[in-house]
Regions:
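Broad gene-expression machinery/nucleic-acid interaction feature
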Residues: 52-54, 116, 130
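C-terminal active-site "lid" helix and adjoining low-complexity regulatory extension at the edge
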Residues: 80-101, 105-114, 121-166
Length: 166
């Protein structure tokens, strides 16, 4: 982060702030610009790496879940982080069901037919938290090169809508 006159500039790199006054000034600047701030929560780990989940929902169904892993805090796959299989997680069935229900509820609440829901499992709690809702599912290679379930189901839904099954 750098300052140009009276406003902050994005340097397009991750920096860690620890000084509360600097954090407060930056937070005020970000909110003044109309952006949203997220509360920091410590992510659960898988084999020593932080992870969160992208849950791809289609109406009342979960089509795919990808585990996004990183040594750092940011897990986005376009930043060359690792995609792992949902089956690799040792989550209890009740936790899996809860994250599915919350993801579907978020999709419904926003009136979306498709959504990519980012879910964080808080470290040492097994509690899923929705941290972001994206208006499209996702471009997940794990699915594309196996079942291709995400796009196949989207096409079926669209065909159903055009055939009068609204």
């Amino acid at each position: 982060m750098c300052w140009a006159g009276d406003h902050a500039c994005n340097e397009k790199r991750i920096c860690r702030l620890t000084n509360r006054k600097e954090i407060a000034v930056l937070a005020e600047e970000v909110m003044r610009c109309g952006a949203v701030l997220e509360e920091w929560m410590v992510k659960e780990k898988l084999e020593g790496e932080n992870y969160d989940l992208r849950v791809v929902c289609r109406e009342d169904e979960v089509d795919y879940v990808v585990v996004r892993c990183s040594k750092g805090a940011i897990t986005n796959l376009h930043l060359n982080n690792k995609a792992r299989l949902f089956g690799e997680l040792s989550l209890a069935p009740s936790v899996r069901e809860e994250l599915f229900c919350r993801s579907i509820a978020a999709t419904r609440a926003l009136g979306l037919r498709y959504a990519g829901i980012d879910v964080l499992i808080a470290r040492n709690t097994d509690t899923p938290y929705i941290i972001e809702v994206n208006g499209q599912g996702d471009h997940i290679y794990q699915d594309m090169f196996t079942e291709n379930k995400i796009y196949t189901n989207q096409i079926r839904t669209i065909e159903s809508l055009f055939n009068g099954n609204r």
